[in-house]
Amino acid sequence: MSKIVFFCIPAYGHTNPTIEVVRELVKRGNQVHYYSFYEFRSRIQETGAVCIPCDDFMPPAPKDIDKKVGKDLSSLVDMTVDVTLAMEDKVLGELRAWKPDCIVSDSICIWGKLYAKKLNVPFVCSTTTFAFNQQTARLMKQSLSELLRMLSGMPRINARLRQLRRHGYEIRQFYELLQNDNDTETIVYTSKEFQPMSETFSDKFTFTGPSIAVPKPSGHKKSRPLVYISLGTVLNRQEDFYISCMKALKTEAVDVIMSVGGRTDISGLGVIPDNFQVIPRVN
């Protein structure tokens, strides 16, 4: 029997792929402690794992977070450092006392990775979409304004990295926080055939495909096609997009399930066509 710790960010798209993995680990007799958030506690506890909420340590999300996600690197580093240091005393104390055999942390939940390295605990990276390394980074084209924003933020980023080093976290460059290296055991919840530049990743990367439970029958009549529309769990406040989808498909012979996220005001989307089911999320 092993003791395994999971860390994840407060996002369904990052938590959901781990649920059945955790359930299977518990079923096999392992003990699992999962550092997550109140919103996900019931789902995690249903697996038999212990959920440890971290809500009180998260800084308030900026109002313009939708514009910053994936674009403002210095803000991401700020949040990472703030959360890592805010939870440090609590989490490191608990980890030292419990003595886990392994730490599994989401690729965006960087504090889990930092704690594992600081305590010299074997680390596994959980990657919910595509793995990211220096080679795949070249595929991401940046505009001049994005490059200038990144360059202007480098002094701030380097200052925060120095702060981490003063607390015992051996981080030399900021990209070490974000990318997957070929020496780290990594689970990727997509097929290798879908991974860009898959040949650049070592055999430490296990491409499992989706990790989901067998779905219950939905009751949908299969006489017409069923269309599912979703923008994920982070950048989903896109009212114009949802309205365009309804206009495009309202007269088509299809049924549509459109997941718009918990922060989208469904009443603000106007009249919902009869062939549409608009909901915050799909279980």
Task: Report the location of each language-model feature.
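Nucleotide-sugar-dependent glycosyltransferase catalytic domains
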Residues: 2-3, 27-226, 231-254, 268
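A donor-sugar binding/catalytic signature common to diverse glycosyltransferases
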Residues: 22, 103-105, 275-283
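Active-site proximal loops enriched in glycine and acidic residues that flank catalytic Cys/His/Asp
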Residues: 8, 36, 231-233, 258-262, ...
